[in-house]
Amino acid sequence: LEAELAARDERRVRTSLKLSGLPSGHTLSNFDFAFQPSVERSRIETLATCAWIREKESLLIQGPPGVGKTHLAVALGVRAIENGFSVAFHRLEDLLAALKRDADVSPQRLRQRKHMNVALLIIDEVGFEPMTRSEASLFFRLVSYRYGRGSILITTNKGVAEWPAVLAGDEVL
């Protein structure tokens, strides 16, 4: 019985990883903490417990290019799947394209979209390119809808003070 349960869990994890869109190969065990001493291993290990996902809190990983933001985001996504959470990974550019396609979809059908109802939505590369006003509005609607319903993990190379420029120059968004 124990072997059967372990096999089922392994299949669930494997299937969930495929469905999530997470790039393969990024785990916490292969993240080079020595290369990036500014990343506190203890803080990442705390995040890896997934308590923040259980509480439907969100996370921002900010830093310059090449420091491992995406690696950490994906590794936390893998850990979330291992802990039974549903996960979807999108680069912002791809997510905005999906949101534009869904702009005229009824609210009931929109709720069925993966990016709306997973436990953890990972949005990579926010701020790589500035958003148009309509893109910023769609992004805000997504974040607003998910508030209190599910966690969002965002990676960005922009500090929070730079976000108005990313969000079509709108300080309110």
Could you describe each region identified by the protein language model?
Residues 2-4, 10, 82, 125, ...:
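Acidic-residue sensor for enzyme active/binding pockets
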Residues 3, 75-79, 141, 145:
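Short, residue-level hotspots on alpha-helical faces of the histone-fold
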Residues 39-117, 164-167:
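Conserved P-loop
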Residues 18-40:
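Dynamic helix-loop-helix/coil hinge segments at AAA+ ATPase domain boundaries and subdomain interfaces
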Residues 1-24:
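Interdomain "pre-motor" coupling segment immediately N-terminal to P-loop NTPase/helicase cores
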Residues 10, 25, 40-41, 160:
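Alpha-helix initiation and N-capping motif
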